[in-house]
Amino acid sequence: MPRLSTELLIIGGGATGLGIAWDACLRGFKVVLIEQNDIGQGTSGRYHGLLHSGARYAVTAPSLARECAQENAILRRIASAAIEDTGGYFLATPADPLYFPDRWLKACKQASLQVEEVEVAELLRREPRLSPRISRAFRVQDASMDSFDLLHILRRAILEAGGHVLLRHRLVGFIHRGGTLVAAEIEDLMTASPLCISFELAINAGGPWAAHIANFAGVHLPLALGKGTMVAMASRPVHSVLNRCRPPSDGDIIVPVGSVSVLGTTDIPVSDPRDLQIQDHEVDALLAEAEMLLPGITHARALRAWAGIRPLLAPPVDAGARETRSLGRAHAILDHEALDGPGGIISVVGGKLTTFRLMAQECLDVVCERFGRSVQCSTSTTALEPADRRFFALPMRHRRLAHREPGNHASDLICECEFVQQGDIHRALAADPPQTLDDLRRDLRIGMGPCQAGFCAFRTADIMAPVLSQPAQELAAFLHERWKGLRPVAWGKTLQQMEFIRRLYAELLGFSQPPSGSR
């Protein structure tokens, strides 16, 4: 069996795990991170795209609100390439409690958050699609953040700092010695071959899988899982983040991300981190709540729906049974040896994507204490440099295309929706070969535009054929995965396009496995 040795083994490749690995590398630790899927395939890649100002938590969790505000400012400095400074508003509608805006505003001031009440008439001039029935409006420091971009630059920073990131490597067990974990048994999911990694300390950053990972160590981790459903609209009628000024509840936010608007979110307790099934009533509720802010949005085209799992630390008696909306979003760092568990493992649970850097800093402070090292955190002042091929915001692509030499470049365009060209794909394949079409989607946004892979998928599969073991099966899997998000919003123009794409693949291209409406 192949063997590796490291100081820190980090389990989980979401924002938390990658942030911990980055901080650890900068502090001089030898680091190996394992992730059972691709970067961005878990909770961090399944959120609504909001960089929190902290205002959402001013009433319910003031300390978390302050943390979000602090980290918001830091991330704007160190990861600006992944952030669009949209700004945001908290808005009071006729359906919201009259008492809440004043209570919320007082809490924001007590938490030292930047909040400014603005005239509704002024806001309507800026955002004319908003409901004229809004009674009060408050400007906050919200922004939108592309988590795929963020995760990729984190991974790049880890590799450049000397760390190792092993994708599609799954933990299957720990090796104990005298009550302390000393090694991990790993399976390479691409080759089905085993790997043993010895370590001095393991850090469990598995998100919704953290309890499962802890079980391998003989530790019960009381996690409550909350499923949140989101709907992406195929247009961007507003340019700022919109929040309902009311106690946190379902459907209280609209986030403009790239060329779409994301309606979010629901919060339903689940027991399995794989339970991502979207219910019709969730989609209906999100659209109905969005209508309160943007009249007519229910008649606009819904692009797709998806769900993510929030891992929340709960009191042991409540884990898995309590309504997850009422549970706190703060993070916790659990040294299991100090809690009468085995040595050699720490778990990091809870938190927000906005606070991932702070979570990593606090975790590494604990690690440094364990190792007897005195090395200060430097991530708050270290810029995360983007790889040129990674960032594909539409305005950037438009500018690049506008400055190209004259000529016929139509054949270069693979994805018309997201303006991805052949060269983009070839550069991605040369730099870091994706294993699947879905990997390339997270890299370049292939298949994420209005056609939802209808026209770009077969072109991309043709280019990737040399690196795909079974191109036809991979294309079928990619299309079916895209259609999972289309089915919950399959009405009107979306339903028409689904039928058009089905017939395109089945009748024109003669594809033996066209997407279908079956579940």
Q: Residue locations for each model-derived region?
A:
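Beta1/beta-strand and adjacent pyrophosphate-binding region of the FAD-binding site
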Residues: P2-T16
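Dinucleotide-binding Rossmann-like beta1-alpha1 core, especially the glycine-rich loop
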Residues: H48-E122, R126
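C-terminal catalytic lobe of FAD-dependent flavoproteins
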Residues: S147, L221-T229, R236-P237, V241, ...
